[in-house]
């Protein structure tokens, strides 16, 4: 039996998250976030990102790496919720990462700035 890929896992989890749209906010945490709207979804990402930073600092001070893994999992989960909330999917992010693959960060940033100038008529 073959191991599922990271992409398979993300897409499967995204499908579960998508299925919570319009669900009962009393029965599902994700449905509750969707029901509360943009601010609630985005606030959770900020909270989880802060927890990732704190857990990473703890690892540097001898803390458990598993705590960092758990916090990153929470952040990824809430990012998947945000993607779904804005009618996007992990496939959109994966496509963007694949587009950037093999390109230096400096080169990618310069291309992005040039594209933004062109879109803004400058």
Curated annotation (Swiss-Prot):
What protein family is recorded?
Belongs to the PRA-PH family.
Question: Where can this protein be found?
Answer: Cytoplasm
Q: What is its EC number?
A: 3.6.1.31
Keywords from UniProt, A to Z, are: Amino-acid biosynthesis, ATP-binding, Cytoplasm, Histidine biosynthesis, Hydrolase, Nucleotide-binding
The main location class comes to cytoplasm
Reactions accelerated catalytically: 1-(5-phospho-beta-D-ribosyl)-ATP + H2O = 1-(5-phospho-beta-D-ribosyl)-5'-AMP + diphosphate + H(+)
One GO MF term, please?
phosphoribosyl-ATP diphosphatase activity
Cellular component per GO, a single term? cytoplasm
* CDD domains per record: NTP-PPase_HisIE_like
Q: Tell me the protein's name.
A: Phosphoribosyl-ATP pyrophosphatase
Class in the EC hierarchy, top level: hydrolase
Q: Which GO terms describe its biological process?
A: L-histidine biosynthetic process
| Natural source organism | Burkholderia thailandensis (strain ATCC 700388 / DSM 13276 / CCUG 48851 / CIP 106301 / E264)
Q: In which pathway does it act?
A: Amino-acid biosynthesis; L-histidine biosynthesis; L-histidine from 5-phospho-alpha-D-ribose 1-diphosphate: step 2/9
